[in-house]
């Protein structure tokens, strides 16, 4: 019987039963979960204690029946295989969690390495692009300088030609009109 069942049989609270067991060092056994487990003999002893208390005996002066055995500790029940199975399951879960934590650590390290490599590649790409742009700018500047020098040469040579061309046009004034002139 558990504490609640004994308490209801005696008509007291479960806390009262627990207090009597502790203060009087009664022979109640405990199961693997730490709960009291009472036998029929334990219930008789508790009824005797209840009777003495109701008669006004102080808790220190209560006499226990001689049949009361000494407390033997925890009661080992047949659930040891269940307990072993549960322990095994918990150990498996612990192993799984430890493995997951290790895997997580490895993944985090791998992600950090990949981020570092990606950053390095990005830096290299930007550097390459900057160099390529610099080369293109240098090529464009060279072409611009070449075009500028060619333009200067062209403008220097074209000025005398334009002056000579303008002089020629002055001398040839109205050559077609002379052909169509009517003689009068």
From Swiss-Prot:
One of its GO terms (biological process) is chromosome segregation. It is found in: Cytoplasm. Belongs to the RacA family. InterPro entries: Chrosome_anchoring_RacA, DNA-bd_dom_put_sf, MerR-type_HTH_dom. Keywords: Cell cycle, Cell division, Chromosome partition, Coiled coil, Cytoplasm, DNA-binding, Sporulation. Required for the formation of axial filaments and for anchoring the origin regions at the cell poles in sporulating cells, thus ensuring proper chromosome segregation in the prespore. Binds in a dispersed manner throughout the chromosome but preferentially to sites clustered in the origin portion of the chromosome, causing condensation of the chromosome and its remodeling into an elongated, anchored structure. GO terms for molecular function: DNA-binding transcription factor activity; double-stranded DNA binding. Residues 75-156 form a coiled coil. The keyword Chloroplast does not apply. Signal peptide: none annotated. GO terms for cellular component: cytoplasm. Residues 3-23 bind DNA. CDD domains: HTH_MerR-trunc. This is Chromosome-anchoring protein RacA. It comes from the Bacteria. The keyword Coiled coil applies. It comes from Bacillus subtilis (strain 168).
